[in-house]
UniProtKB/Swiss-Prot annotation:
Residues 469-494, 966-1298 form a coiled coil. Homodimer. Binds microtubules. Interacts with kif2c, aurkb, incenp and SKP1. Probably part of a SCF (SKP1-CUL1-F-box) protein ligase complex. Residues 731-774 form the F-box domain. It comes from Xenopus laevis. This is Microtubule-associated tumor suppressor 1 homolog. Regulates microtubule dynamics during mitosis by stimulating kif2c. Probably recognizes and binds to some phosphorylated proteins and promotes their ubiquitination and degradation. GO terms for biological process: regulation of macrophage chemotaxis. Residues 1-28, 399-421, 536-585, 636-695, 788-808, 883-925, 938-962, 1309-1338 are annotated as: Disordered. It is found in: Nucleus; Cytoplasm, Cytoskeleton; Chromosome; Midbody. Belongs to the MTUS1 family. The gene is mtus1. GO terms for cellular component: chromosome; cytoplasm; microtubule; midbody; nucleus. Residues 1-27, 541-555, 883-910, 1324-1338 have a biased composition (Polar residues). One of its GO terms (molecular function) is protein kinase binding.
Length: 1338
């Protein structure tokens, strides 16, 4: 679960972002409008830089404390304006959460303003200290795991009772971790998204986030704030963008919009709060004039298919626009309220979660209602949390935890609207003017309810859509915008032709029956009070219209809301445009929005800009179905130039839907009939159904229309079939520069629309009914999308005739602001127009534009001829009625516009009305002639096609008279024009009521301006007081400098006295020390002499003793050494003689034993020889006998002879082997003997060698001893010589000392050095050191 709490007020802007809700730790850098310490690197203007840096926070760091912090000093970029920019010192303050430092200081002010002038420091510090007391307590501990501390800290900031807090109510931007929100409300799921979130969450994550971080060129004079809270229980990546509404000095408190986006298959309730707050400090606004000004609302379309490229069109509409993401119909509920209670200013921000999710319902769609109040000052999150907890009791929310569907009870489809109404009354403050609630009536319809192909369920996504303000122009980006506009225009043509609906009364939607009773409860807002309306109404200054932005085209803040057509170009091209926009860079998006905001700031647009406002609710259904036959690659293959040009035209169209959605006043509201039919709409609410053909959509299209009493009575009175009513509702003027492209664009767009229409037959049917409720003058516009079966042709009495194939034909006149092109869906809507008081030049320009657009609306209608329109009966009345509405929408329109439209409307229907410049109307007319000819040919073909349907009737009936056909056409045209006139009358009445509401709003703005003037006076008085304080401070500074100089003089005098005393004391000490030194020297000399004599005597005695001992020791060493040498020699000689004798004896013994053994061996050899000879003789004898026997046996038996021979050969072999064995035995005997002798000899040799080695070692030892003795002898001799020399020297020194004693010169330092007491000891040391080696041998 993730949390986003972002407020921007009074030039305070801070953004909080969260990465999937893992660990939210935000680092926001404060910015000042003039005193910036954050340089804008990209040169995109001093706009808001998104400094929200998310540090990954480990789990063990979650519970650490946070404090608010801002830099110590601010660098001044420009001269300080004390009156205009007194509050500009502190802009936004940071939430820094470094991992090492979890505490932040909440000072927004210069704490170390050392770089600035002294005057600036005094005044700035004065003001900033007040703001610091007001806004930032010294330290506000914010613990992320506990919401109470946050609420207390923030409440302390916002609830300050100081005057500055009343002037500029500032709010904190706090990023709370998931623990805080879980404790605050764990079961609330809020997600701000306008369309299916699964597509945008993945494919447009970076682009949509970048839009929020776009630098805004904004004035320091006034600002609006949006408070967006975004929670997500799912594991999807949460995308939130800081929503910023910044307006110039001329912008009033504008209305807040809430649209209940019926997003199917989403498990998250949508909540987007837009808390706008004008800068109450009129004195701070340089040249502030609180006239009506345009506001920008960013429109975000649906995105469904997560596998496709997202094609969302982010467009800022001119005047007030609504976030149009409805899939079918939108209920506009407007309550223009004026709250006089001034004490509520510092209370609740107008934020509430209104989600009626029934726990028992199983409807596939989720009811997502958003709610935003207008101009409610931002307050502490403490109060917000309390309100959320209070509203929890009244609003049942089923926590889905990422389920496939967020279920809504059909019994209470819009029950939250009444709760929102109650919340409006509670949350409205002094600045609250209008509250526009756009609730979704078809919230119970799922995306897969009526589609043959299952659509992927939307995944949970959260992103806040920023509201842009005036941004500086950028010439380079303007070209890109034109190309994108043109591309989006072409895509819109291709998309609108694919809408196919098929009504059947078999299966109504689930929540359509119960919605009626609940809807009546919702529409119960109090009637606005017009008592305080004053006659003073500010007129808009003349402004130049600049190029529009594909993302933003502006609408007036008080234009009446109405239902937009499903096929309105303001909404239909948005999915395709987003597909193109995803390719673009973040910088392009930022710069586009900057240019559009600058355009909105400078252009002059009357409030009478009227669009087909039902586009805002209905387009996500049909425009996306229109894409069914358009391949995805084809949408993306358009070149950059085509994309830019299409987007430029679409921005003007989208302004109409926004204007209609926002300018609805207290009375305008949509009945429950609308929500029921929206719930029974056959169109799936999938935001991206481009891959599905219209045929597949037709298969499961189920519609069961419902009507309320007022509507049915009116239809019965008009005698019309309510199911087939086709009426042109809106033609509204727009400035020529904003809405009219060149004729070349017209030609391209017409051709593109014709091509798309020719290949895509679409069937649509819309009924628009008007109902007035009570005295509030509510406009009830209901759109029902349905298509009759092809077999049964139907005739619409109100709107004309249907074709024999059952295709209703509707005429769509183009709105002058660019939303009039309603191609190929034939789903017209009725929009309401509202004229507000404007300057004479603006009225004239709008009238001239109206006349041009009315002609264009008829001239460009012939491109629908390729759409198989069977009869001209159905066409002529519709187009004529469209021209009439164009004429009647402005009271003082030119008469030529009506004439031109009536002459051209013969055989035309407006599939896409593309505004062109008045100069370029010639080529457009020439093109329309060709289109008319083609449409006539198509009509004939269609007539031929219809003939086989009734072959029997054609054969029996006579041919139809052409005059009667013309007569019926004229009757149908007249009937349609009557209906149009009645509709226009109703529009006029409703617009009058809306104008009254606008007067209330303007009066409120005037009151606020007066209050701000009072506050400015108070601030100027305070500034004068501060200047007086500055003068006092300067006087006190001079006085302190004088006192300082006096103190310095006194200090110098005292220092001089102290120095003199010090010198006197030093001289006294020197004299005393000299006297003391002389006395001590005399004493030391006497002591030294006595001690020297003692030491001399002692040393002499020691030297004598040493000499005697040394001589005795030397003699003893010499005698002992001689004796040892003699003994060693004798021992060596004895050992040698013994060894020689032993060796001789052993040699003799060995020789004797050898000789004996040799004799014995010889004897044995002789004996063996004798034995051998005897054996040989025996063998010879035996052989002779054998021979004799052989001879005998040969004679007897040859076998026996053979055996005898074999025996003889074997005996010979045995003898040979025996001889060899004897020889080997002899050799073995000899070897054994040799081995024995060798072993004995080896042992003897080893013994002899050991003895020799021992003798050698002894000899070596003897030699070493002899050498050692010789060296010791030499050392002793040397030591004796040294001692003799030392004795001589000592004697000499003794003589010198005696001489000195006699002469008395011991005190002289030069003479004392040779007779120092340490010198006599050296001879003794030397003698001791030399005598020590003599002792060591012992």
């Amino acid at each position: 679960m993730s949390v986003q709490t972002a407020t921007t007020e009074n030039r305070f802007q801070s953004t909080l972002d969260d990465n999937n809700g893992n660990n939210s730790e935000s680092k926001n850098i404060a910015r000042c409008p003039k005193y910036e310490w954050n340089a804008n690197v990209n040169d995109q203007g001093p706009g808001v830089i998104d400094h929200s840096i998310l540090d990954q926070q480990s789990d063990n760091e979650i519970n650490k404390h946070y404090l608010l912090q801002s830099p110590n000093a601010l660098e001044l970029d420009s001269t300080l304006d004390y009156i205009g920019n007194a509050a500009g010192h502190c802009d936004t303050f940071n939430l820094k959460a470094d991992k090492g430092c979890k505490t932040v200081n909440s000072s927004l002010l210069h704490e170390n303003p050392g770089e600035e002038d002294e005057t600036v420091d005094y005044i700035n510090n004065e003001l900033c200290n007040k703001m610091q007391d007001t806004l930032c307590p010294p330290s506000i501990p914010i613990q992320t795991s506990a919401s109470d501390e946050i609420h207390k800290g923030l409440g302390a900031i916002t609830d300050r009772g100081s005057a500055y807090n009343k002037i500029a109510e500032q709010s904190l931007c706090v990023q709370e971790s998931t623990d805080y929100l879980c404790k605050m409300e764990p079961k609330w799921t809020v997600q701000a998204f306008f369309g299916d979130a699964d597509k945008l969450c993945r494919n447009e994550a970076n682009n949509l986030v970048d839009i929020s971080t776009t630098d805004h060129k904004y004035d320091h004079n006034s600002s609006f704030g949006i408070f967006t809270l975004s929670l997500d229980f799912s594991d999807e990546k949460c995308m939130r963008e800081d929503s910023l509404v910044l307006s110039g000095s001329e912008k009033p408190l504008s209305a807040s919009i809430l649209e209940g986006s019926a997003l199917p298959n989403s498990s998250i309730d949508v909540f987007t709060g837009s808390v706008k707050k004008t800068d109450n400090i009129d004195g701070f606004c340089q040249g502030a004039e609180l006239s009506l000004r345009d506001l920008d609302y960013l429109e975000v379309p649906h995105q469904k298919d997560s596998t496709e490229t997202p094609q969302s069109k982010l467009s800022l509409t001119s005047e007030h626009s609504v976030f149009t993401s409805e899939t079918s119909e939108v209920m506009l509920e407007v309550d223009a309220r004026r709250v006089m209670d001034k004490t509520v200013e510092s209370h609740l921000p107008n934020l509430r979660l209104s989600s009626n999710v029934g726990k028992e319902d199983s409807a596939p769609g989720a009811s997502l209602e958003e709610f935003v109040s207008g101009s409610v000052p931002a307050v502490a999150p403490e109060e917000l949390a309390s309100n959320l907890i209070k509203d929890k009791n009244t609003i049942k929310n089923k926590e889905s935890h990422g389920e496939a569907h967020s279920l809504e009870s059909p019994a209470r489809p819009d029950s939250s609207s009444s709760e929102l109404k109650d919340l409006l009354s509670n949350l409205s403050g002094q600045n609250c003017e209008d509250t526009f609630i756009i609730s979704s009536p078809n919230s119970g319809i799922g995306s897969k309810a009526f589609t043959s192909t299952p659509l992927p369920e939307s995944k949970n996504m959260t992103f806040s859509v920023p509201v842009l303000e005036s941004i500086t122009e950028n010439n380079e980006l303007q070209q890109n915008l034109d190309a994108i506009k043109y591309d989006l225009e072409g895509l819109r043509h291709s998309s609108d032709s694919n809408i196919v609906t098929k009504p059947t009364n078999k299966k109504p939607a689930v929540g359509s029956v119960v919605g009626k009773a609940k809807k009546n409860e919702v529409i119960s807002f109090p009637k606005p009070s017009f008592k305080n309306v004053k006659a003073k109404v500010l007129t808009r200054p003349s402004l130049q219209a600049k190029d529009s932005n594909p993302y933003a085209s502006k609408t007036s803040p008080r234009s009446p809301p109405s239902l937009s057509n499903a096929s309105s170009p303001a909404q239909s091209p948005r999915p395709l445009s987003s597909a193109v926009k995803t390719v673009q860079k973040r910088s392009v998006i930022n710069q586009d929005m900057k240019t559009e905001a600058a355009i909105a700031k400078s252009q002059k647009q009357p409030i009478t800009k009227q669009l087909f406002p039902t586009h805002s609710a209905h387009v996500p259904t049909h425009s996306k179905h229109a894409l069914g036959k358009v391949p995805r690659a084809a949408a993306l293959k358009h070149t950059q130039n085509e994309t830019e040009r299409a987007s430029s035209s679409n921005s003007t169209r989208s302004s109409g839907s926004a204007a209609a959605a926002l300018t609805c006043t207290a009375g305008s509201r949509v009945t429950e009939n609308k929500s029921e039919k929206a719930k029974t709409s056959a169109k799936p609410s999938a935001p991206n159904v481009r891959l599905m053909g219209p045929n597949k959509i037709e298969q499961k299209g189920i519609i069961q229309p419902h009507f309320d009493k007022a509507q049915s009575l009116k239809e019965a009175k008009e005698g019309t079939v309510s199911a087939d009513m086709d009426i042109l509702a809106n033609i509204v003027p727009l400035p020529t520069k904003l809405a009219i492209p060149s004729s070349r664009n017209l030609h391209k767009e017409l051709i593109l629309g014709i091509k798309n229409v020719a290949s895509q037959p679409a069937k649509g049917r819309v009924q628009t009914t008007v109902q007035r409720r009570g005295s509030l003058g509510k406009n009830i516009l209901t759109i029902r999308v349905s298509s009759p079966p092809r077999e049964k042709p139907q005739v619409t009495v109100e709107g004309g005739l249907n074709s024999p194939k059952g295709r209703p034909i509707s005429v769509k006149a183009s709105a002058a602001n660019g939303t009039g092109s309603l191609p190929r869906t034939r789903l017209p809507c009725r929009g309401t127009t509202l004229q507000r008081t404007a300057s004479v030049s603006s009225v004239c320009s709008t009238q001239s534009e109206l006349s041009n657009l009315s002609t264009r609306s008829t001239t460009t209608t012939s491109s629908i001829k390729t759409e198989d329109i069977p009869t001209a009966k159905c066409i002529r009345p519709n187009s004529a009625s469209g021209a009439l509405t164009a004429k009647s929408s402005i009271p003082r329109g030119r008469s030529q516009s009506l004439k031109v439209t009536q002459t051209v409307t013969g055989t035309k229907k407006s599939p896409s009305i593309i505004p062109t410049l008045p100069r370029s109307s010639g080529p457009a007319l020439s093109l329309t002639k060709k289109l008319e000819a083609r449409s006539l040919q198509n009509v004939e073909k269609n007539k031929q096609k219809t003939s086989p349907r009734g072959p029997v009737t054609q054969a029996q009936t006579p041919p139809v008279d052409p005059k009667s056909i013309e007569l019926t056409k004229c009757k149908a045209a007249c009937e349609q024009q009557r209906g149009v006139i009645e509709n226009l009358k109703n529009l006029l009445s409703s617009s009058n009521q809306r104008f009254e509401a606008l007067t209330v709003v303007v009066q409120q703005l005037i009151n606020q301006r007066e209050e701000t003037l009072k506050k400015r006076k108070a601030l100027s008085q305070e500034l004068l007081n501060l200047r007086g304080d500055l003068v006092c401070a300067s006087s006190t500074c001079e006085r302190l400098e004088k006192e300082k100089n006096e103190l310095l003089k006194a200090y110098e005098g005292i220092l001089q006295k102290v120095k003199e005393e010090h010198h006197a004391e030093l001289s006294d000490l020197e004299e005393k020390l000299k006297q003391f030194y002389t006395g001590e020297c005399e004493k030391l000399q006497s002591i030294f002499i006595e001690e020297a004599e003692k030491y001399k005597n002692e040393l002499q005695e020691k030297v004598d003793d040493l000499n005697t001992t040394h001589e005795a020791y030397r003699l003893q060493a010499e005698t002992s050494q001689i004796e040892t040498i003699h003994t060693l020699k004798e021992d060596y000689e004895k050992s040698l003689t013994e060894l020689k004798d032993a060796k001789d004896k052993e040699n003799k013994i060995l020789e004797d034993s050898f000789k004996e053994k040799q004799a014995e061996v010889e004897k044995k050899i002789l004996e063996l020889k004798d034995v051998n000879e005897s054996l040989k003789e025996k063998l010879k004898y035996e052989e002779e006998q054998r021979k004799l026997t052989k001879e005998k046996s040969v004679q007897k038996n040859p076998q026996v002879m053979y055996l005898e021979q074999e025996l003889e050969s074997l005996k010979a072999v045995l003898e040979i082997k025996n001889e060899k064995l004897h020889q080997q035995d002899k050799k073995l005997m000899q070897v054994e003997k040799l081995v024995e002798t060798n072993t004995t000899l080896v042992e003897r040799l080893n013994k002899c060698q050991q003895e020799n080695e021992d003798l050698k070692a002894r000899m070596v030892n003897h030699v070493a001893l002899s050498r050692q003795l010789s060296t010791e002898q030499e050392v002793l001799q040397r030591s004796l010589e040294k001692e003799s020399k030392a004795n001589k020297r000592l004697s000499m020194e003794n003589e010198e000392l005696l001489w000195k004693l006699h002469n008395g010169d011991l005190c002289s330092p030069k003479k004392l050095s040779p007779s120092s007491p340490g010198i006599p000891f050296h001879p003794s040391r030397n003698s001791g050191s030399f005598s020590s080696p003599t002792v060591s041998p012992r």
